[in-house]
Curated annotation (Swiss-Prot):
It is an enzyme of class 6 (ligase). It holds the Pfam family Mur_ligase_M. SUPFAM superfamilies: MurD-like peptide ligases, catalytic domain (SSF53623), MurD-like peptide ligases, peptide-binding domain (SSF53244), MurE/MurF N-terminal domain (SSF63418). GO terms for biological process: cell division; cell wall organization; peptidoglycan biosynthetic process; regulation of cell shape. This is UDP-N-acetylmuramoyl-tripeptide--D-alanyl-D-alanine ligase. It catalyses: D-alanyl-D-alanine + UDP-N-acetyl-alpha-D-muramoyl-L-alanyl-gamma-D-glutamyl-meso-2,6-diaminopimelate + ATP = UDP-N-acetyl-alpha-D-muramoyl-L-alanyl-gamma-D-glutamyl-meso-2,6-diaminopimeloyl-D-alanyl-D-alanine + ADP + phosphate + H(+). Pathway: Cell wall biogenesis; peptidoglycan biosynthesis. It comes from the Bacteria. Its EC number is 6.3.2.10. GO terms for cellular component: cytoplasm. Keywords: ATP-binding, Cell cycle, Cell division, Cell shape, Cell wall biogenesis/degradation, Cytoplasm, Ligase, Nucleotide-binding, Peptidoglycan synthesis.
Length: 510
């Protein structure tokens, strides 16, 4: 964050100082980072008091100041130097931190944080900062990681860790930028119409990227049309002097070209795009290879990330880097060198016993679930060696009235892709629908065991991650391939972590 005095911050957010004199507030400077976890605070930092499930952020204010925080941003005096803002009604937001906000104090701190980020972003943009916004129903984090890699050779990049993309993570990321930052990459998530527009007001992007319109959070939005309208808030926010990168292979995204005043850059898997990929092939771990075409030049790309769907993510990252002045050759080299970064997102690990774990346990919606299953099938069914495949799947959250049908479709798809073992984790109607869909699809098919899998092909429903892990440890064989995927609330990341951490052959049958 840029250096500001406590008094300057109080003026920006409309707060009053407490437990610090006006004279001291005018001289005490915030020189460190903004943190909502008191354990992460450092010298000169700004600590955000936010409500938690087990503890009130006010309870940690003293420890944050003891650790070096210059001041606390809170909704009431906390006995240490603070900027106090009055409670407000909780808005219709995505940030789960307001789940325990019973008195409006958390909403007040979030509103103040947004004001501070808005002021800082304006100063940094005036100094030459380029802000890039990314939205889409899926792929935001993977695209952000690739984009950070391709922009790094051009200057200093700030991007959110993991999926910090809501009303807390978005301004928090903005405030990581300093006067040395050249590129600020921001993920922009939404559960309601207007969410993306609100985020764009905090840090107006000069480049916007829309990946896709899918069914993530369908239960919150109500319809796919509303999802498209909400994603379109990003291109609508980009000024005429900026650029909007659109996935031309998604009709709902392509239609957004008429909604923006900015210049449109289309990416595609065929030559209809301004930036496009030549023939795509996958290696034995489903890592894409393709020729990148743009600006009458071309270069070969070999991605280090898993899944055919990563091609579009890479094209969007490439288009942004090209807009920022990189050459096609530079972009291709950076994409090829980019490793997987964010945890639990299509991370592929092959253990010493030959078991391959595809960890995509951070989140799930129907589109990303299909992509994960397709990657699993590709890895398991290589011509030189067919391997047993396991799909360990949990619930896809927030699908509303479509939840039963979508889970049923995923269960059936697992059978159609010839997955050897489907382990459905959890309870409830959606989980039952996924399990029953697989069972019914198997019965509807030939009913005959395949030569590769014999009687091994089964679909089972277990109660939780511990039960799934116990089953896997008992039944895995050397060379098996395991996909672990669910919405984050299912907690299957712990299953993937345990599988990767298991001693070589220590828990696998010979």
């Amino acid at each position: 964050m840029i250096e500001l005095t406590v008094a300057q911050i109080a003026e920006i957010v409309g707060g009053a100082v407490a437990d610090i004199s006006p004279q001291d507030a005018a001289h005490r400077r915030v020189t460190g980072t903004v943190e909502f976890d008191s354990r992460a605070i450092g010298p000169g930092g700004l600590f955000l008091r936010l409500p938690g499930a087990r503890a009130d952020g006010h309870d940690h204010a003293a420890s944050a100041v003891a650790a070096g925080a210059a001041v606390v941003l809170a909704a009431r005096p906390v006995g240490v130097p603070a900027i106090v803002v009055p409670p407000v009604a909780a808005p219709n937001v995505l940030a789960g931190v307001l789940e325990h906000d019973n008195d409006g104090s958390g909403a007040a701190v979030l509103a103040a944080l947004a004001k501070l980020a808005t002021a800082v972003a304006a100063q940094l943009v005036a100094g030459g900062l380029t802000i890039i916004g990314i939205t889409g129903s899926s792929g935001k984090t993977s695209t952000k990681d690739l984009m950070a890699a391709v922009l790094a050779p051009l200057g200093e990049v700030v991007a959110p860790p993991g999926s910090f993309n809501n009303e807390l993570g978005h301004p928090w990321t903005v405030l990581r930028a300093t006067r040395r930052t050249d590129y600020l990459i921001l993920e922009m998530a939404a559960r309601h119409h207007g969410n993306i527009a609100a985020l764009a007001e905090i840090a107006p992007p000069s480049i916007g990227v829309v990946l896709n319109v899918g069914t993530a959070h369908l239960g919150e939005f109500g319809s796919r049309e509303v999802i498209a309208q909400t994603k379109a808030e990003l291109p609508q926010a980009v000024p005429h002097s900026g650029a909007v990168v659109l996935n031309a292979d998604d009709p709902a995204v392509a239609a957004m070209a008429k909604l923006t005043a900015a210049r449109v850059v289309r990416v595609s898997r065929d030559n209809t795009g301004d930036v496009w990929a030549g023939p795509v092939s996958l290696d034995e771990l489903a890592r894409p290879r393709f020729t990148l075409h743009a600006h009458d030049a071309q270069a070969e790309v070999r991605l280090g990330v898993c899944g055919d769907h990563q091609v579009t993510n890479a094209l969007c990252a490439a288009a942004v880097a090209l807009e920022c002045g990189a050459s096609v050759e530079q972009v291709a080299a950076a994409l090829t060198a980019a490793p997987p970064v964010s945890r639990h997102r299509m991370q592929v690990t092959t253990r010493g016993d030959g078991v391959t774990v595809i960890d995509d346990a951070y989140n799930a919606n129907p589109d990303s679930m299909r992509a994960g299953l397709q990657a699993l099938a590709w890895i398991a069914h290589q011509p030189e060696a067919t391997r047993r495949s396991w799909a360990v799947l949990g619930e896809m959250a927030e699908l509303g009235e479509d939840a039963i049908a979508e889970h049923d479709r995923i269960g059936r798809l697992a059978v159609r892709l010839d997955v050897s073992r489907l382990v459905v984790v959890g309870t409830g109607r959606s989980i039952s629908a996924m399990h029953h869909g697989a069972v019914l699809e198997e019965a509807w098919g030939s009913g005959e065991a395949t030569a590769d899998h014999g009687a091994d092909r089964t679909a089972v429903n277990v109660a939780d991650g511990d039960a799934a892990l116990a089953l896997l440890r008992a039944e895995l064989r050397p060379g098996d391939v395991v996909l672990v995927k669910a919405s984050n609330a299912a907690g299957l990341g712990a299953v993937a972590d345990a599988l990767v951490a298991d001693d070589t052959c220590g828990s696998v049958r010979p």
